[in-house]
Amino acid sequence: MTKDFFTKGSVCFLSLNMGYGGAEKVIATLSNEFARSGREVTIVTFFEQNDFTHVLDSRIKLHNLSIQNFKMSFFSLSKFIYRHRFDNFVANIWPLTIFSFLVRLIWPKTKLIYVEHCILSEQYKDKNFTFRALQALSIAIFYRFAHHIVSVSNGVQDDLIDYGTPKKKMS
């Protein structure tokens, strides 16, 4: 991962919500550490649930896009990204990662980091062929927009490589 991500600029984390979960706990922990080090931190969510309010540093900005229709989230996120310029943008978990390519289109200098927590081929193995084909295509196309892709295990990394994710962007 680029050294600048750990030391410079504002950071925005994208999550569906901040309900209790592993990815959300990682977001809360990293956000608190970045805020304590003096960085400007924003967490943007699609839905309102926030079970981490009591543990988040008061300097962290929370923004809820209040999505009523998931199909409209593309436009809500585009508008948010356009209005707020971040130095670093971190998207956790497919399908949020595929929406985040917008960052590179709107603000090309923003460092885009994807974090994948699951073996997607296993998580969605019971979905129909069309879903799995579209998922594979979306990963092969949109994961190339990321500056860096963090996989939480070797199994997750191998799965993403099987989908066509560039190995040189991964850790």
Language-model segment annotations:
Residues M1-S171:
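Membrane-interface segments of envelope glycosyltransferases acting on lipid-linked substrates or membrane lipids
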